[in-house]
């Protein structure tokens, strides 16, 4: 595999084209905004295609599905290369010698999620709880792209009311987990509008129910969670989704109460939740026809930028390390490689470390704005701003 990865990098100059990784879910309807043919969303017993994972080395932890579901593939002039295997076989070639010496892999997952109903109120385990089942925590951040249908419920529920966090919050939430028969648990959370071009940073341990806006997400490298909401989109979700990443021992001994260990009560009940976690684009580069902004920030675990170029505009960027990018709108070139938004297979690249730290010219060759999003893993951009509103 090492020689194949080296050949692919040599062939492309370190700018690797990625094929789309489509992921099905069987517990929610799709939003049908991923650009697929109508008949391609329904995968039978596997559910519906609701997500597209980007530059992914993460396996989708579904009840049923192929062994490589969620994994991205590098397109070459010969065979396709599994990105997870490629990084494992040639970490220094992909991530750079110094970074590979301190990081086992890319350590992040980018995705587009596209649901026809609000995602149920759920939580991701903090590091210590995830480790009990051999998994990673799952801090995550969202960006809501503009000019896309927002769906039926473009508002998200986050956290719990402060009085719950300040008291015995477990006793408030546990009855809903035990009964497992409705969605009334949502009354204990705040709802926030999903505003185009904005987003949120949601750390592991925070309860959340993302709304129906098409969302570009950047997160830790994991597919761990526990559902706290039984009724969603008109049906009762299997209670196995509550216990999905709970050890057999904790489930046997503690039952629903085991999940209370996951809840970060201080963060959930933060009276300044919005102020501390909203993500508003932070522009750091402006020139004629050029606008580049941080859209994922506030965490050392990942970061990301949105670049917008007017027709005919170009920019030369130098980054700090390996990253993948999604061309969201328009057409152009990245280091001489033709790209086109909205065309899976022509809209996704991974730029290896040694190429990324050299000048990369990005050119808009089309008649509309070229918009692309860059995704970085842990510790690559220590200068990214903190989350929340500027004070």
Report each predicted region and the residues it spans.
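His/acidic/aromatic-lined binding-pocket segments of jelly-roll/cupin-type domains
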Residues: 110-112, 119, 140-143, 191-192, ...
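Functionally critical, mid-to-C-terminal surface segments that flank or help form catalytic/ligand
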Residues: 256-320
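Double-stranded beta-helix
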Residues: 157-184, 216-266, 366-391
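Short acidic-glycine-tyrosine-enriched beta hairpin
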Residues: 189-201, 333-361
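Conserved short histidine dyad/triad with adjacent acidic residue
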Residues: 119-130, 146-150, 300-319, 333, ...
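Ligand-binding loop in jelly-roll beta-barrel domains
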Residues: 114-118, 126, 134-137, 147-150, ...
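Transition-metal
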Residues: 1-168, 232-271, 304
